[in-house]
A protein has these predicted regions:
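ABC family nucleotide-binding domain
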Residues: 2-215
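Conserved switch/coupling elements of ABC/ABC-like ATPase nucleotide-binding domains
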Residues: 217-221
């Protein structure tokens, strides 16, 4: 078991009103599993993913990832934990526009203290794995949406994380590119035995997931 969540709750204040977004989520995910979490906008799935990634604290509950209780970690401890254990893929790619594909993929290794030579070698190797060997020196504005997402995927995997959290990774892509990206994610899932947790609206993801979990009104169905 690589992820264990027990009774996760989260409430937001909207003016004078408290809105309960997560109402007690309990979930276990095995190592190497490709899990899809589906649900309508406002169901709480992105909030849950942010809590899993240590980006947002929960109000109540326990989260164990890779045998680490993360709900009690401070900001510095969380940053170190994310760097060593997790990778993130976003709908909007979140690439640095002034950097090349190679430099974007290198970035997490800088924070890990990896030498320049090793950073370049590892970033090149990862870009080759995602099919961008010939686009390494292009900036995001010179790449298609699918190519930018491939750069984002390479960056997410560069530190060899145990867990990848993906928030609507195909949300900005056309149907053909969506299939290409999902094929890539599943291949990486199998080849690296990396655990994937994918939040999505897309029913296409069902075909790739080992398990599909529906979230509705802050609860798992």
């Amino acid at each position: 078991m690589i992820i264990q969540c027990k009774d996760i709750k989260k409430t937001f204040k909207v003016g004078d009103t408290s809105v309960e977004i997560l109402k007690g989520i309990s979930l276990e995910i095995n190592k190497g599993e490709f899990t899809a979490i589906i649900g309508e906008s406002g169901s709480g799935k992105s909030t849950f993913l942010n809590i899993l990634g240590g980006i947002m604290p929960c109000d109540e509950g326990e989260i164990v990832i890779n045998e680490h209780h993360i709900e009690g970690l401070n900001e510095n401890e969380l940053a170190l934990f994310r760097r060593e254990n997790m990778g993130f893929i976003f709908q909007s790619y979140n690439l640095m526009p002034q950097l090349t594909a190679l430099e974007n993929v290198e970035m997490p290794l800088i924070f890990s203290g990896v030498s320049k030579k090793e950073r370049i070698e590892r970033a090149k190797s990862m870009l080759e794995k995602v099919g961008l060997a010939d686009r390494m020196n292009h900036k995001p504005s010179e790449l298609s949406g699918g190519q930018q997402q491939r750069v984002s995927i390479a960056r997410a995997l560069i530190n060899n994380p145990s867990v990848i959290l993906a928030d609507e990774p195909t949300g900005n892509l056309d149907s053909k590119t969506t299939i290409e990206i999902l094929d890539l994610l599943k291949d990486l899932n199998k080849n690296f035995n990396t655990t994937f947790v994918v939040v999505t609206h897309s029913q296409v993801v069902y075909e790739y997931a080992d398990r599909v979990i529906k979230m509705e009104d802050g609860l798992l169905c």
